[in-house]
UniProtKB/Swiss-Prot annotation:
NCBIfam families: RPE4, uvrC. It is found in: Cytoplasm. This is UvrABC system protein C. Residues 207-242 form the UVR domain. GO terms for molecular function: DNA binding; excinuclease ABC activity. Residues 20-97 form the GIY-YIG domain.
Length: 642
């Protein structure tokens, strides 16, 4: 494809028809990948800025890479801000300031659809069918809180299936972590009272809760029910301890405390979460592509991207001004369909101290990040020299597979760069064959759901299975690389600087064969365990070079081992998940009258094997092709297998 004009000349040509109105513009590279999205109050004036002579290096590189340009007119600046944020989230352009880690925060969910509800960990922005508390900064925060609540209030933590199948109390009852409602050790009314206490605690009404518990303790004491009174006393003590440890605040109720700091052109944004006056943890973020950007710009882009994914509190407290504050507030309100939002920068008082503390934490996080970043930079330079690369690696892909005699086979790819592992880029490849157990049990499932629990990772489309793949590492690698290079043809912006394959000389030939087939020349190396398969004696195989080893004490050797081990562990994890899922699905296969069609209908209707197990007989009969007698048989069989 020959392009007539690119770069600044292209922008000049677009200026002729560019309107003097607000809107959003998009720059594309030669492969028509979006490389930058920008907003403007006046599109013509903004584009004119790109043909000036005093541009910074980042902008010059961006313009040099621009081969196509499009723009959209909007009705208002808020609409332009909103569209820009949505397009950045969708395309992740490399020259935009990006929030890489955008996974949603976890919540504590209290079920409301059971006589004896339990508390669960929940992750997702859609909050329905229950009472939710949070968000929390990490799963660790949620798990710690759940453990403390279970000790204090002793609500059940088991699944409905386990609950319904009990004939005697389980271990949780014996260690005083549950009141065993499954076998009638507590009645519904008393259990509901406990649930109400949990709600009060999680909603921050701890003072009222402790007052009510104190009154109840006195009543029980006056009735000579000293054992029950002592239990309430212990609960009050435990609540006081948890409050002290959690850092309850009377300064803010529902708020996010957000501080931004900068050092050597790198930024850290630290977020502290407060809900119902309780600290719910903190987490640092390190936005990318911030070269030549100001704090105002970085913080504005952070807020717009962050609150596309996260729940918005009543108040956002920040430590630095942002551009277009009122329009940012309106955009966040529209994104989240809310009517009220307050963003403030406190000058003095308790809130100012909170945001100052967040800034101190942000600076510490940034310093730790920069140390790690500098080490990675040094290692990347060594990798460039060791493997004869033309440039310092921005992206390294590491491949491995896992199987048991060819069954439940998966291939994986993990990705590393200058900032460490990029887990959003990890991939899982299903390599099931017609003869494998996984194939026979998992056939009703889409490739997207084939590996249970790996929803954070993409599974490449499954190619037609081969009967001769069983136990053949070379064929597995051939399939993985064929599918990966096919995708790279459509995603040239994700071409790795280096591929590392867990394997030896034979694997080297397979990689070369697939590379030649696709007419691609990506640098690659095969890394094998070496003599006696001992760690530290790894051998490296490259085309046209003698096999070589490295001193096991060298930092680069330790780094390469970390890369290899990450891929290996990821492969084993997904192999086990696939094997576990296949074993579970076999319970459906054992039921007379359940063939592939009905099994597929069950999984499609309920969404997962666990949901099928949790279903009642009446719910099972709602599935097309499942009558009452078959539903009863399914219910009995699944509950017998649990």
């Amino acid at each position: 494809m020959t392009l007539e004009i690119t770069g600044s000349e292209l922008i000049k040509s677009k200026l002729i028809d560019a309107p003097e109105r607000c809107g959003v513009y998009r720059m594309f590279d030669v492969n028509k990948q979006v490389i930058y999205v920008g907003k403007a109050k006046n599109l013509k004036k903004r584009l004119t800025n790109y043909i000036k002579s005093d541009l910074d290096n980042k902008t010059l590189r961006m313009i040099a890479n621009t081969c196509f340009l499009e723009y959209s007119i909007t009705n208002s600046e808020v609409e332009a801000l909103l569209l820009e944020a949505q397009l950045i989230k969708k395309f992740q352009p490399k020259f935009n300031i990006l929030l890489k880690d955008d996974k949603s925060f976890p919540f504590i969910k209290l079920r409301l659809d059971h006589d004896f509800p339990q508390l669960l960990k929940y992750r997702g922005k859609t909050l329905n069918s229950g009472k939710f508390f949070g968000p929390f900064a990490s799963s660790t925060e949620v798990n710690t809180t759940l453990t403390e609540l279970q000790k204090i209030f002793k609500l059940r933590s088991c699944t409905d299936n386990y609950f319904n199948s009990r004939t005697r109390p389980c271990l949780q009852y014996e260690i005083k972590r549950c009141y065993a409602p499954c076998v009638g050790k507590i009645n519904k009314e008393d259990y509901r009272d406990l649930v109400a206490q949990v709600k009060d605690f999680l909603q921050g009404r701890t003072k009222e809760l402790q007052e009510n518990l104190s009154k109840k303790m006195e009543e029980l004491s006056s009735q000579m029910r000293f054992e029950e009174a002592a239990e309430i006393r212990d609960r009050i003590k435990a609540l006081s301890y948890v409050q002290l440890k959690a850092g309850v605040s009377d300064i803010v109720k529902d708020a996010d405390i957000i501080a931004i700091v900068e050092k050597n052109g790198h930024y850290c944004v630290e977020v502290f979460l407060y809900r119902a006056g309780q600290a719910c943890g903190n987490i640092p973020y390190f936005p990318t592509s911030t070269e030549n950007s100001t704090k105002e710009e970085v913080l504005e882009y952070f807020l717009l991207q962050f609150y596309q994914k996260q729940q918005v509190p009543a108040e956002i407290i920040i430590n630095h001004e942002i551009n277009d504050k009122e329009n940012v507030i309106e955009a966040i309100k529209k994104i989240n369909n809310i009517t009220k939002l307050n963003i403030i920068i406190p000058i003095s008082g308790g809130k100012a101290k909170l945001v100052q503390n967040a800034a101190i934490n942000a600076l510490f996080s940034l310093e730790q990040y920069l140390k790690k970043f500098a080490k990675n930079q040094e290692i990347m330079l060594e990798i460039k020299e060791l493997f004869g690369l033309s440039e310092i690696s921005e992206r390294i892909e590491i491949y491995d597979n896992s199987h048991i005699q060819g069954k439940f086979a998966v291939g994986v790819m993990v990705v590393a760069g200058k900032a460490g592992f990029d887990k959003k880029e990890y991939r899982v490849f299903s390599l099931s064959s017609r003869n494998s157990s996984l194939s026979s049990h998992a056939s009703p499932l889409s490739s997207r759901n084939l590996i249970a629990g790996s929803s954070s990772y993409f599974l490449d489309p499954v190619v037609k299975p081969r009967d001769d793949i069983v136990g053949d590492d070379y064929e597995m690698l051939r399939q993985v690389l064929t599918r990966r290079l096919t995708r790279l043809k459509n995603e040239p912006h994700k071409l790795p600087s280096l591929m590392i394959i867990d394997g030896g000389r034979g694997h080297l030939g397979v990689v070369k064969e697939v590379m030649d087939k696709f007419e691609m020349n990506i640098p690659f190396v095969c890394m094998s365990k070496g003599v006696d398969r001992n760690a530290g004696l790894e051998q490296f195989h490259m085309t046209g070079k003698e096999v070589f080893t490295l001193d096991k004490n060298l930092p680069i050797m330790k780094y390469l081992q970390i890369l290899r081990d990450e891929a290996h562990n990821f492969a084993i994890k997904n192999h086990r998940l696939g094997r576990s899922r296949a074993i579970k699905l076999s319970s459906l296969d054992d039921i007379e009258g359940i063939g592939e069609t009905r099994k597929k209908a069950l999984l499609h209707y309920f969404g997962s094997y666990k949901a099928v197990c949790d279903a009642t007989i009446d719910e099972l009969t709602k599935v097309n092709g499942i009558n009452k007698s078959l539903a009863e048989m399914i219910f009995r069989t699944l509950h017998k297998s649990l």
